[in-house]
Amino acid sequence: MTTISDLPYDLLPEILSRLPTKSIPKLKTTCKKWYALFKDPKFVEKKLGKAARETVFLMNHEVNSISVDIHGIPKGYSVSMDFTGTLTIPEGSDLEIFRIHHCNGLFLCATMNCRLVVWNPCTGQITWIIPRTRYDSDDIYALGCGDDKSSSLHSYKILRCCDDNQKKPVSEIYDFSSSSWRVLDGVTANCFIECNGVALKESAYWYASDKRETPKGKFILRFDFATERFARLCLPLNFQRDRDNKSVVVSVVGEEKLALLQQFDHRVHGLKYSKIKIWVTDTKIGEGKDLSWSNILVEELADDNLPSVTSFLLDEEKKVAVCSDAVCSDTDTEDEDRRRIYIVGEGVDEFVYDEVSTETSHNWPFLVSYVPNLVHIEKDAPIVEV
């Protein structure tokens, strides 16, 4: 009797490419032909275009898979959110994840005990990254790729911005093709990076400001993983540079655009409100040397509704943002530690998740939208204490 593993090899890519991406790793041990196919860069690249987008929420050092549904915009809307599972790093149940950096379905995770691991949540594969010098919780990281949507891990790189032993800023690159770090001579950000970065195409982006602390010295900072250089890009023309911002956050819209959220306080007839503005880049990233922006959303909220946005995901068509926020516990005011998810947009203003904790958490909640990827991660590097 003929079984599926006996099918001609040239038929397998078409058949298996129709399966959900997350189910494929469970099948790779079926036979040698299948295992070889799942490591084939052409097959991996084909699956990248078919996998459904997923959302995860970093909260209390755990990565949770969530589903957010929004219907009936702008009138008669209904919103709901479900936790669909917890993603666990293999052999890492005791790990406390401090930050997540995402690129093409791969996660770079910094832990509370200053370790660094690259993780493919789709395949479950990981590799620990040995430091050149001891990691610090203040280090800035980004995961990127010199080739857009590359199907080979060897094309990926890690950027680390840190201080050397003399407290001077240093930028260094971990190159997966050589499994080693190297210092970028004369290349530093030379600014304050004020939010978690995002990866798009071959670059990483942050909201940043000059160390001179002047209103004009605020910009989008880009690091190009192909050229390994920083560049400063413009903010929206009507960005409130002179405001005392509660938060400014960068996000990605699909696979082609950046979004920027600014949250600040203002008063109307003596009452304090929190205003949110969201912009989206007009053109696809990479089509111009600088950025041009369009303001697509302005919302005014009661001040206690959204204390401090830590991340957001934008539905540009519906003009709705899914935001995470945090309230740190305060013994003086008896405020409790809270982690929340909030929907804001045209005709929408609602919490879908609100967790209260008596214990203070030291990591900000963070939302990530990603497409599962079959990029193969080689065996773990040994863990070395530095």
UniProtKB/Swiss-Prot annotation:
Source superkingdom: Eukaryota
Keyword tRNA processing: no
Gene3D superfamilies noted in UniProt: 1.20.1280.50
Annotated Kelch repeat ranges: 155-203, 340-386
Keywords: Kelch repeat, Repeat
Span of domain F-box: 1-48
Short name of any one Pfam family annotated for the protein: F-box
SMART domains in the record: FBOX (SM00256)
Name of the protein: Putative F-box/kelch-repeat protein At3g17280
Protein species of origin: Arabidopsis thaliana (Mouse-ear cress)
Lineage of producing organism: Eukaryota, Viridiplantae, Streptophyta, Embryophyta, Tracheophyta
